[in-house]
């Protein structure tokens, strides 16, 4: 069982709040006054999955939002996390569903012009996930110690689970995550899904990704990249072995640009809080698995990720 200590990143102040969507109803369909300022809802999709699958996964969600608010929804399909971060900084997006580290980066890059609205609540009532290091089941590597002298693939430099969290925790353990130190080599595979594929194709010995850590391991757990790939029949969990798990990490937030109208932000939050009950299939597809719903959050909950980014920048300056 995965430990869920309150010292986990971002969870100390948040705790385990109640399920916020149980008594929520979907906003009544109709055009809003805020549509004069937001005539198109521009939404960013983080990288890490191929474009066709990303668009198919959110198609029902996009159509429902358009029908509810009666304005077009334009999707920005970014090649990587940085694409969405930079689009927020350039005021080219209204909203995106982000990782916690990507939110922190967007907040820093935009001068504080983003606000977190809500995070996923898992089936056990928690609001966290774990970063995991995995290898091929036939690799003979069964522990983090077995990765010494082996190659490791990171997912994305702006990913919490795929880069920042493991690097931080490895340093705490006395493991230098830089290339040619503990690991023989490291590199970026181009996203979470691409990292799994690279490991399965023996381009790297191990890789990093995220999972809820809950539910049946054979199905890729209840939520996360592994679950998504199992559902798409891209992965059989019998071919993969998880050899290390991080401390629990606060789930990434649904994010909105701070400069948008308050009524728009309130409608967007209400839409998402009601989504799991009103449209469970659309919710599961959008949220990459079977979470329980959404819980409101505030910027202070993500302060640890801003601190981590600043520490990572300091490490780069010392190289």
Features from the language model and the residues they span:
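A conserved helix-loop-strand patch within extracytoplasmic ligand-binding domains
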Residues: 119-163, 167-179
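A bilobed periplasmic-binding-protein/Venus flytrap-type ligand-binding module shared by bacterial periplasmic
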Residues: 46-47, 130-141, 245-263
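Hydrophobic residues within well-ordered alpha-helices
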Residues: 88-89, 147, 199-200
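An extracytoplasmic/periplasmic, membrane-proximal ligand-sensing/linker region
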Residues: 25-45, 49-60, 225, 256-319
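N-terminal secretory signal peptides and thylakoid transit peptides that target proteins
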Residues: 1-14
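Pocket-lining segment of extracytoplasmic ligand-binding domains
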Residues: 153, 157-261
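Extracytoplasmic small-molecule ligand-binding "clamshell" domains
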Residues: 28-104
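Beta->alpha turn/N-cap motifs
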Residues: 77-81, 92-110, 119-120, 192, ...
